């Protein structure tokens, strides 16, 4: 089982990171293939709303923008399990969490039935 654990906190040793590292160790202890990612270590951008991923000529679930988040999104789509943690600042998750969710969700959302290209996942 492939599991990806993503820390969307800028603080690598505080509460969110501690909880995620505990989950990482737990998954690893039962034999999962686990990858841990700190979002604040990579260069990423949010969705630019260019709609290229919705073009009939574009392969589904491919975001046009290439940055450090692009290969991570591809690995997320191949994974069996995704665990993301973010602290809450001013009532909202961090900007890096939002950027990840915008890029991930928008490119897998089907305008045909407003469902996901990855039904059941």
Q: What kind of region is each of these model predictions?
A:
Residues 43-76:
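Cysteine-cluster motifs in flexible loop/terminal segments that predominantly coordinate metals
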Residues 14-15, 45, 92:
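Residues that form or flank phosphate/diphosphate-binding pockets in enzymes
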Residues 18-21, 50-52, 96-100:
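Short, glycine/charged-enriched secondary-structure capping and boundary segments
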Residues 63-121:
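Helix-loop-strand module that forms the ligand-binding subsite of alpha/beta enzymes
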Residues 1-32:
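N-terminal beta1-alpha1 ligand-phosphate binding loop
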Residues 32-43:
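A short beta-strand-loop structural module common to alpha/beta enzyme folds
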